[in-house]
Amino acid sequence: HSMRYLSIIGTAICCVMLVMTSVSCKQETLSSTTQEKKVAPWYVYIDGSSFKDIEPVKEIISSISVFGNPPKSFIDECHQNHIEVYQAVGGNEETVDTPQKRKALVEKYVSDCNANGYDGIDLDLEHLSPDIQDAYTEFLKLASKELHAVGKKLSHCVSFYPALYQDNETKMFHDPAVLNTTCDLVRVMCYDMYFAPGIDKPELKHRDDCMGIGPTSNYLWTREAMLFWMKHIPNDKLVMALPAYANDYAVTGGIKGRQIYQSVPDSINGILPSPTWLCYEKVNMYLYDGCLLYTSDAADD
């Protein structure tokens, strides 16, 4: 990930809020006596972090995927509140390109889960070469087998790059059919439709999400992302990941972009907008140089 922080209470807690698609498609009534937990955020554990960060929203959180190294006491407290905890891990092509590396890595996953009490591993490997697909398939099969053997789960973050919108047969580094048979959860990252920090990076010019200026996401693109993955993964395994940040561009001179993780002052009176829990409604803001013109193509409702 490029770091995606969402400030829920005071300090930065979550990178992205996640909603089960199988829940979002249901008709729910206010009279329902059973409230199903629906939110599964990524959580960045840093110095000063504690379960107190999560306390205000613990009743709606089903699981968290943790970047960093929380103490076992933190994981235990999550379990006491019926929250599953995944260890978020990254990597690249060289991480899994030989049988020896794959075996050692999976052994480490199992060891970390058993030692710290994690409920599973959340794989966040992104933008790998499609040429690695065969090796990655073997990696997924091994990770799934060994984690499930000790009662742990396997989660995977997936994207919907613009190329998939144009060609559903685009080869990826992970085979969707293999993800379906090996993973317990598949988290669809409905963001980085445009990756603002990559707009001026020559080494990223080949990436679809760095070809031009645009929003982090929008509703129609998110819908297409979910529809694509629903063709490959059952709804009860899918998680819809929504961005808690916006793209910010300076477009005079050399174009540069960045990601912003908090509300910006009104350009006229300098006052921050009222806090809102609906962070997704503000994901499409832009900055046009010094004039501070912010726009959004998100729907009002």
Identify the residue ranges that each predicted region occupies.
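Chitinase-like catalytic core of GlcNAc-active glycosidases
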Residues: 35-214, 218
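Bacterial N-terminal signal peptides
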Residues: 11-21
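A short, hydrophobic C-terminal helix/tail in secreted or cell-surface proteins
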Residues: 297-301
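Bacterial Sec-dependent N-terminal signal peptides
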Residues: 21-36
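Glycan-binding loop/region signatures in secreted carbohydrate-active enzymes
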Residues: 237-296
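Gly/Pro-rich active-site loop or hairpin
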Residues: 198-227, 283, 288-296
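Bacterial N-terminal signal peptides that target proteins for export
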Residues: 2-10
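Active-site region of glycoside hydrolase catalytic domains
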Residues: 187-188, 194, 220-253
